[in-house]
Amino acid sequence: MLQIKIVAVGKIRERFLMEGIKEYAKRLSAYIRLEMTEIADEPCPERLSAADEERVKDREGERLLKGIGPQEHVILLDLQGKEFTSPDFSEYMDDLALMGKSSVTFIIGGSLGVSGEVRKRADYRWSFSRLTFPHPLMRLMLLEQIYRAMRISKGEPYHK
């Protein structure tokens, strides 16, 4: 069974998002082993110098990369990444399985983005959209797309 990890900066505080995440985690349990890890976000004042922004991204980046093994396939959610359609994402996940990738890690960075080291470690950079979304909401959206991909892959009704 495929192991999927979601590593994200920050805590989810909104109850409605936590409920949605729990629901999709439950639905996904029939298809994958899911692990979700929250990384503490680096405290920062509202106005930061460019050097301070890089320092924050570097510290968060170290924490993001800490638990990622060398064999894991890493997908970074990134505004500058490439977009998928849902069927294309499902096919991409199927291709990973065919290549023998049994562990896939998705990274959701902090509000300032991610460090260069995190970008270098990413095997793929995926953009959901050119729009900006709240990072806690991205976790729910990511889980829904993973669930949709699993259903498409199995030929089960869900995607319309």
From Swiss-Prot:
S-adenosyl-L-methionine binds at L77, G109, F128, S129, R130, L131, T132, F133. It is an enzyme of class 2 (transferase). The keyword Methyltransferase applies. It catalyses: pseudouridine(1915) in 23S rRNA + S-adenosyl-L-methionine = N(3)-methylpseudouridine(1915) in 23S rRNA + S-adenosyl-L-homocysteine + H(+). It comes from the Bacteria. Its EC number is 2.1.1.177. GO terms for cellular component: cytoplasm. Pfam families: SPOUT_MTase. SUPFAM superfamilies: alpha/beta knot. GO terms for molecular function: rRNA (pseudouridine-N3-)-methyltransferase activity. Belongs to the RNA methyltransferase RlmH family. Specifically methylates the pseudouridine at position 1915 (m3Psi1915) in 23S rRNA. PANTHER family: METHYLTRANSFERASE, RIBOSOMAL RNA LARGE SUBUNIT METHYLTRANSFERASE H. Homodimer. This is Ribosomal RNA large subunit methyltransferase H. It comes from Desulfitobacterium hafniense (strain Y51). The lineage of its organism: Bacteria, Bacillati, Bacillota, Clostridia, Eubacteriales.
